[in-house]
Amino acid sequence: TPEVLAALDAAGVHGTFFVVATGYNEKYLPLLTQAAAAGHQIALHSASHEYSDIYRSSAAYWKDIALLKQRIAPYVDAESIRYLRFPGGSTNTVSRRYGGKGLMPQLKTEVEQRGWQWVDWNVCAEDAVGGHPSADTIYRNVVRETGEQTHCVVLMHDSATTHTTAEALPDIIRWYADNGYTFLTCLLYTS
């Protein structure tokens, strides 16, 4: 995350960070304070990211979100966060395996009933699909997936196994800027 924050800062761009708070990355959670202070949006993703656990039922999903909020509360105002991204996206099919075909529609309704907003992506950097893609491959993936779209929500991952994402970020930002795009957090985009 320090490299991603540095790249965003150098470009004067703010992003939205959908947070995972599993055991392997809890040591990085203090960086959320820095990210929020720099003007980035902090949003919810998952405490465990274990599909078989979180998608067993609505109760299991919300238990995971409550645990996530508990884990990030020392670093940001977790209770004020109203944006989330479902693991696998809002149209994922893996949730059906564990919670049935009605689970995702139910969860989307429950998010909205809470006055929250769920966010999906329409451009994927494909930086977490395995094989450790190069920075150039990530860049090309983003450009290809953007195509003729005028409004893009780009999914990128920031983890120990996706370090080339941070390397690709300056070129991706430059490409979007050169092609007339503006950069907004999800909060500003939906406001």
Predicted regions and their residues:
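Active-site beta->alpha N-cap acidic-glycine motif
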Residues: 1-86
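Alpha-helical scaffold elements lining the catalytic groove of polysaccharide deacetylases
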Residues: 50-76, 92-151, 165-167
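Short amphipathic alpha-helical segments and helix-helix/interface helices
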Residues: 5, 29-33, 105-109, 170-173
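Catalytic grooves of carbohydrate-active enzymes
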Residues: 143-185
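Conserved small/polar residues in nucleotide/adenosyl-binding loops
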Residues: 189-190
